[in-house]
Design a protein with these regions (language model features):
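Hydrophobic residues within membrane-embedded alpha helices
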Residues: 6, 16-20, 223
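Ala/Thr-enriched low-complexity intrinsically disordered regions
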Residues: 19-25, 32
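Cationic, low-complexity basic patches in intrinsically disordered or flexible, solvent-exposed regions
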Residues: 9, 17, 260
């Protein structure tokens, strides 16, 4: 008999997906496991500093959003469970995803991301401001190195380590991913650690971090790194639209053609 537990929302959780054959645990689709994983993310309270910060921000609010309810909890991942493109961000913005409850929604970084994803065929619209606006992603999954909004937009090392098991589980379920776009140095390192390549590759053989840098890993997946579309980068010209579009143009080409 299969061992069944329940997630914090009451959803059934089976210990491991089975084969569907007699005597095995019932066959569970990866999409179901991703829903359970997202439920676990939402109910995580593992980092006291981040819990206190996201709740404080949700209570005090920003003046322009004072009449809006804030999500104020860990923000789950989103997208197409069969995605071949994986985007790894840093963490929810205090008045962006921490307010709206969806990654890259309601802030300037999201405005850059949705425009690019729509331009290259991964999103059905170029603008998304609310988690209930019907946005649909195709062949793309979005996650982050940390799922809680951190002070000064920077989770510390211990917080990243505590959040990483969620990313490890996610990578195990996203079986079709062929291209990973890491937005920023922290996302780059977090993905390399979660995927195991940080430890398996000698330091001199690890993919380098630089905007537009591209590396094919031993398992055939391609890692592309990009500057994060934060205002610090976009307002100063460190990251331009042309630079930004070049990353997603390249990712789209690899995904659609099988090129490496």
């Amino acid at each position: 008999m299969s061992s069944v537990s329940r997630s914090k929302s009451g959803l059934p959780r089976l210990s491991e997906p089975g084969t569907g054959e007699a005597g095995s645990t019932p066959l569970i689709r990866p999409s179901a496991h991703l829903l359970i994983l997202n439920d676990d993310v939402i109910h995580c309270a593992g980092c006291p500093r981040l819990v206190a910060w996201r709740r404080s921000v949700a209570e005090t609010k920003k003046r322009e959003f004072r009449n809006e309810p804030y999500w104020g909890r860990p923000v789950p991942s989103l997208g197409d469970p069969g995605a071949r493109l994986l985007i790894v961000g840093l963490a929810p913005a205090a008045h962006g995803a921490n307010r709206t409850g969806r990654m890259f929604t309601g802030d300037s970084s999201g405005a850059w991301l949705w425009e690019a994803l729509h331009r290259f065929g991964f999103a059905d619209r170029p603008i998304s401001l609310r988690r209930d606006d019907g946005l649909t992603l195709t062949d793309c999954w979005i996650t982050a190195a940390a799922h809680c909004a951190p002070p000064d937009n920077r989770p510390d090392r211990a917080e990243l380590d505590r959040c990483r098991p969620f990313l490890v589980r996610e990578l195990e379920l996203l079986r079709q991913v062929r291209v990973v776009v890491a937005l920023g140095r922290i996302a780059w390192e977090s993905w390399l650690r979660a995927s195991g390549w940080w430890d398996r590759l000698p330091a001199r053989e690890r993919p380098a971090f630089a905007h537009g840098a591209e590396a094919v890993l031993p398992d055939g997946r391609t890692l592309i790194t990009s500057f994060h579309p934060s205002r610090q980068n976009t307002n100063t010209g460190r990251l331009t639209r042309e630079m930004w579009h070049s990353v997603f143009s390249r990712a789209s080409k690899i995904v659609s053609s099988g090129e490496q």
